[in-house]
């Protein structure tokens, strides 16, 4: 099983949404994939989720960011305890920031990195990003600009 942690997933429109969906959907052709995604519009998301490949399971979490992160993590813990996880993939360092400190270190992690999300706002922000990257097994950059970071 593969687990994908994301804030950005269709039916919302956007480049990261498309990237994460296509990655998840293609991986689900060979392996069961569970996507833990943020919830934004229940009606359109319910319709979207019902028309997906059965090997791709989407679980959505709404509410305040503080609780949403923790609820996703509780689900991730449950999934890890019941299944053999091959890899955890996140759409950004932000999706991995909370669970990276708590997940079993024997499960490989991959973090997708997009240029505008690593623009550093201050030293604390930079440290948060770097801490997640240091604990991540593979960092996948979408451009040479991002790779230079």
Where are these regions (language model features)?
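Extreme N-terminal starter segment of soluble prokaryotic enzymes
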Residues: 1-3
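Short, well-ordered alpha-helix to beta-strand connector turns
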Residues: 30-31, 85, 136
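Short, well-structured alpha-helical segments in soluble
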Residues: 74-84
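Short His-centered aromatic/hydrophobic patch
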Residues: 90-96
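Phosphate- and divalent-cation-binding pockets in alpha/beta enzyme and binding domains
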Residues: 97-99, 148-149
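A short, active-site helix/loop in glycosyltransferases that binds the activated sugar's phosphate group
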Residues: 136-149
